[in-house]
């Protein structure tokens, strides 16, 4: 049986699975074929359990299709292949990751002799600053479809820092949970290795520290400090834009950390290649590991966030009230939590029960602003401008894809962002019936799962209309 069997499986899995799934779960696996048993080695227990739960049938099916009755048995283990293998016998999953999800690293200098996470030394400097907020953990991060992959990737990094996903780059709009995940990773690493040097900071703090070091003729101390950490977590990396000296220093810090198997996690409000004012060599490096988007939370996740927040405050929030708020406030988690805090404060001050009518009163200015900002007319104008067509095209009977797809997108956005019924939405789109609107909504939902471009279009339009 050929040792190229796993490579054949990888090629098929890469074709069959969404790009993000393949990059996150399949690519890190290593394989060893021996005595009619194919052993798959996962970097940690989390990956092992996920692969066995989600992809066991896929892999077994491929083995059977390639080998028939002679298909090897599968065995899963945590760790790496035995080092006694010859290079020719090693079978690893070095299939190039799709560019829009993650890019494998170009050849770099050989890593230092530092072995990484089995021998983390005690902190050397008493002035070392972690800045990790202990309140932000994976346990109190509300997971939904919009952030599931980002949370899973962050969890893997916390369990195996300096491993497969280095750097990890999280991007998305304001208030979607990027900072929460940074702190959760920091807490996860320090729970596993209490002596680990984990530093969280905003990108502007890095710039300020560098300026002070230059002013005090202490740039070497600055370099030693940042290059000695075990994990560097930097928020809002887009603020490095047009700061040439800071980018130069971070470039060398980035290289030093990766060569030492030290973890880097970065966040931004946009995809790495879309960050203006940042050098191409840095943007390229941002994509060396894994890049994951965090989307605005869908309705069910917004409701879960409100219910969890209310529970943390010992407040009984009726389900219908949570749905009422979640249906009307859609842009980000911070806005949701702020609205709920306002409702709770009003209830405490007045002693009234939290009902839908009470929420309407407590949030009347906020709800009025939302309804004013997001109308079907506004959605139609925004979608037409985005796709470079005319609003009249959206209302017409034209069925060409260049018009039909934007029309479906606009209908789906109208259902998501307004409180209009399906018949009302249909009337606003040239007198179409409610079944046409329903079909459009289902079609866009399907395409968001299948097409990276449609998913990005939907997220961009939601962000524009909700801001």
Curated annotation (Swiss-Prot):
GO terms for cellular component: cytoplasmic side of plasma membrane; cytosol; DnaA-DiaA complex; DnaA-Dps complex; DnaA-HU complex; DnaA-L2 complex; DnaA-oriC complex; nucleoid. GO terms for biological process: DNA replication; DNA replication initiation; negative regulation of DNA-templated DNA replication initiation; positive regulation of DNA-templated DNA replication initiation; regulation of DNA replication; regulation of DNA-templated DNA replication initiation. Keywords: Acetylation, ATP-binding, Cell inner membrane, Cell membrane, Cytoplasm, DNA replication, DNA-binding, Hydrolase, Lipid-binding, Membrane, Nucleotide-binding, Repressor, Transcription, Transcription regulation. CDD domains: AAA (cd00009), Bac_DnaA_C (cd06571). Changing residue 223 to A: Does not initiate replication at oriC at 42 degrees Celsius, does not unwind oriC, does not form active ATP-DnaA-oriC complex, can load DnaB helicase, ATP- and DNA-binding are wild type. Residues 98-119 are annotated as: Disordered. It is a peripheral membrane protein. Its main location: cytoplasm. Disulfide bonds: none annotated. Residues 348-467 are annotated as: Domain IV, binds dsDNA. ATP binds at residues 175, 177-179. It is found in: Cytoplasm; Cytoplasm, Nucleoid; Cell inner membrane. Changing residue 285 to A: Moderate decrease in DARS1-mediated ADP release from ADP-DnaA, binds DARS1 DNA normally. ATP-DnaA poorly hydrolyzed by datA-IHF. Coiled coil: none annotated. Changing residue 417 to P: Decreased DNA-binding; protein does not localize to the nucleoid, forms inclusion bodies at cell pole(s). Residues 98-111 have a biased composition (Low complexity). The modification N6-acetyllysine is found at residue 178. Inactivated in part by the RIDA complex (regulatory inactivation of DnaA), composed of ATP-DnaA, Hda and the DNA-loaded beta sliding clamp (dnaN), which rapidly hydrolyzes ATP-DnaA to ADP-DnaA in a DNA-dependent fashion, preventing reinitiation of DNA replication. DnaA inactivation by RIDA is further stimulated by DNA synthesis. Also inactivated by IHF in combination with the datA locus, which promotes ATP hydrolysis of ATP-DnaA, called DDAH (datA-dependent DnaA-ATP hydrolysis). HAMAP family: DnaA_bact. At least 4 systems specifically target DnaA to prevent more than 1 round of replication initiation per cell cycle. 1: SeqA binds to and sequesters hemimethylated oriC, preventing DnaA binding. 2: ATP-DnaA binds to the chromosomal datA locus, hydrolyzing ATP-DnaA in the presence of IHF. 3: ATP-DnaA binds to its own promoter, repressing transcription. 4: RIDA (regulatory inactivation of DnaA) via Hda and the DNA-loaded beta clamp (dnaN) hydrolyzes ATP-DnaA to ADP-DnaA. Belongs to the DnaA family. Plays an essential in the initiation and regulation of chromosomal replication. Binds in an ATP-dependent fashion to the origin of replication (oriC) to initiate formation of the DNA replication initiation complex once per cell cycle. Binds the DnaA box (consensus sequence 5'-TTATC[CA]A[CA]A-3') and separates the double-stranded (ds)DNA. Forms a right-handed helical filament on oriC DNA; dsDNA binds to the exterior of the filament while single-stranded (ss)DNA is stabiized in the filament's interior. Also required for replication of some plasmid DNA; binds 4 DnaA boxes in the minimal plasmid RK2 replication origin (oriV). NCBIfam families: DnaA. Domain I is involved in oligomerization and binding regulators, domain II is flexibile and of varying length in different bacteria, domain III forms the AAA+ region, while domain IV binds dsDNA. Binds to the inner membrane via domain III (residues 117-378). Binds dsDNA via domain IV. Inserts into acidic phosopholipid-containing membranes via resides 309-399 which plays a role in rejuventation of ATP-DnaA. This is Chromosomal replication initiator protein DnaA. It comes from Escherichia coli (strain K12).
